[in-house]
Amino acid sequence: MGGKRGVFHYLQRTAIQGSPTMISKIANNYQYGGDYIQTDVHPFKRHFEELQVGETIITAKHTVSEADIVNFANVSGDNFYAHMDATSLDGTIFTGRVAHGYFVLSKAAGLFVDAKKGPVLLNYGLDECRFVKPVYPGTTIGVRFTCKEKIAQEKRNPEDIAKGIVKWLVDVYDETGETVAIATILTMVKKKNQD
């Protein structure tokens, strides 16, 4: 087997080893734990071409309250015992009433989203979501919001908006700096050049 087919065949078995920073640079795909580029300009104010893989904002923080948990349960209908009944936690991994994982993710979105109209056209989805540490009332959370990957899209027709998909690493952390939730979200972002 020769030519391109042979190269692709053997590349399927290739693994790259290195630090998250090195792999991020080689693959142009941000790897968790790698160096990031902290910016003061919110990435939702930037067009697709202006975003850099590894570009990160650190958000404001929010202290989770019992009212947050009750309100989220009322809105979502998720009344799972670990969120609503502190007396039923014997024999579980929880030491007290715990916030909903989806509340933590929703609050993270409230912290990282810039609500003003800009190049971000829409939320395109969610991948790889994990809730890795319980969040109890009194826990303060913040978000490291990092441009993970950019995927250019072709216009479907001349009237279509020139755009691309941006994958973002959402790293929600507590007051100790430990990750409590991690996810990849996708947004559709307008290109500056509409040709």
Which positions does each model-derived feature cover?
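HotDog/MaoC-like acyl-thioester-processing domains
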Residues: 30-52, 131, 135-140, 144-195
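Short, conserved aromatic-histidine micro-motifs
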Residues: 18-28, 123-135
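C-terminal segments
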Residues: 1-29
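Alpha-helix capping at helix-to-loop junctions
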Residues: 16, 114-117, 150
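A broadly conserved detector of short glycine/acidic/proline-rich loop/turn motifs that flank catalytic sites
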Residues: 14, 21-22, 63, 135, ...
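Hot-dog-fold acyl-thioester-processing enzymes
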Residues: 30-125, 192-195
